[in-house]
Amino acid sequence: MKFDKYKYREDFVFKDNRICLTYQGLRKLYKPKKLTGSRIGGVLGSDSYKTPFQTWCDIMGFFKEDLDPYFLEAGRIIEPKLKEYAELQIGKSFKSYDPPSIKYDLFSSNDVFGGVPDGEEFDANGNIVSILEIKTAQLDKYKWVFKDNQFRLFTEDGKPVVSQTGGGLVKWFKNGEVLIPESYKDQLSLYLYLRGITVGYFCVAFLRNEDYADPHSVKFMSPFNKYLNDGIVSEEGDHILIWKKFEIDLKEFEKKVHVAKQWYEDHVRKAISPPMTSKDLEWFRYGYPDLEH
């Protein structure tokens, strides 16, 4: 992780436990990022991996994260396969978009919210009736190490180490019920809200260690929603696949939208961060060790 865009005291000051960009810093900012589906959870508090302050730093371009390619590359290859398989099994068709061709934003007319849904379903009249959110989740729990101010996969002989077989299922199942993480709900809810519709679908595949090692060879053959109370499938070699309908109340979610929009106005437009927690301060000092108390 690198903090190399802004210089302390020249581009920002630390005051009242907040970061404030100076005029020089604002010139470097140019254009802040928008609140996408993957960022809104950090603002609303539903993302267990990012605090509001870290989300602000992301939007303002404070750091560059070294993303681990192991899971990302597998997801890039496998998600289109999963979408195609789901369409055949469920009997629906979803239009997907090429992010670079639309500048990674399907909602360019909105100056606060943006992003690219995984797929949109259209009716015969060309109206969007539902939105698809695809997730490739880890079946197993892996060993991680904290290095360079971020968590990285621990490897032996160039291969990730599994710390608990099937451990990735814990946050997804409880008493036989599928638990969609709140940050994912907020992600899909935002896209539904921006389209003015109420129905979406989660399509989730739990990938095995061998799937990540050879993503091009992955084939889906299991029926959706075939699992026991703990999420384990009954036949060896099957993938655990989830298809779950998701509906929102537009007026109810609008309350969250107003909160997020006000947060954006208060902190991004004004270039003043949310207050730091003690962990935020420790995290930020990795890039700016001379930051004063």
Residue spans for each PLM region:
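Accessory terminal regions of nucleic-acid processing enzymes
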Residues: M1-H293
